Amino acid sequence: MTWIACELHTHTFHSDGKQSLTELASGAKALGFDCIALTDHNTMTGLAHKEQVERETGLSIMSGMEWTTFFGHMVTIGINDYQDWRKVGPEDIHAGLARVHEQGGLAGMAHPFRPGSPMCTGCYWEFEIGDWNEIDYIEVWSTTFAPVKKNNIRAYRLWTDQLNKGFRLAATSGRDWHSQEPAGEPVSVTYLRINEGEAPLTDRAVEALSSGRVSVTLGPRLDLEVNIDGDVYRIGDVVSGPDKTGRLAAVQVMADFTVRHEHWHLPEQRFTISLQSNLGVLSEMAALPAQLPLHAEIPVQGLLWMRAELWGVIQGVRTLIAFTNAIYFA
């Protein structure tokens, strides 16, 4: 398997963006991305020349659309056909989710706590979710310098709350990218760990997101591995099999500080790596990049999930810099 750098929330002038698909793809390639999802508001017309743009830029483009309603915005990825969003009301979002899943697509909550009307029509999520198993992911980091923004902190907490309830859903970032104007702030990246193979990269990216093989960062890519009695589990995996009560997990946290290194800057510092779970903080360790990977032994009993977080200072602010998606425990 290999990691690819992705941007999962973008717009062109086919909705409210100020860029063509070619400009968007060229800009993404220049920033070190391997793949984007085009998610224009309520239209897929911007994808008409997708294959040509992919050939010209060398960037892979996932098909998608942002359902933009009065009751919330929902990003759909991996769909091939337009789905009419207009009949979905606040109490029947599951009808829309079913249509997306019938196409083999994924559905994610976009910026669920961004201020809504009249500032941004429908940006605040108000749909009633009856079954969280039908939500594939939450966009917990939205726009640039995402982790310092209150609405994103709430979205991250929402994701954690659902993990604590036993649901298994991914967490992503999304720039909500509308133009090629310089960001001026740190840009986050969603890394997807895709299978090797002959299938189109975009199909493998959708599968990776569906499986929760996701790591999100403002800079270095964080990875997590658990070894229990010789069985190795990675991000998105489910620890199952014989009863592991009373056993210890050998946990390894890795960080690659070379990825896209020309596109981000962190001052020299000791970073804090935190292992989080439904039981709270399992372990915290301070380390310089040269001291990685770090290792810990963690009791398995009572665990539903585990993720790694990297904390440090960026642009003078101490904040969450990177996080992995979860490893789950059956």
Language model region names:
Residues L169-A170, F271:
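Residue-level recognition of the N-termini of beta-strands and the immediately preceding loop/turn
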Residues M1-W3, W177-A330:
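C-terminal functional module detector
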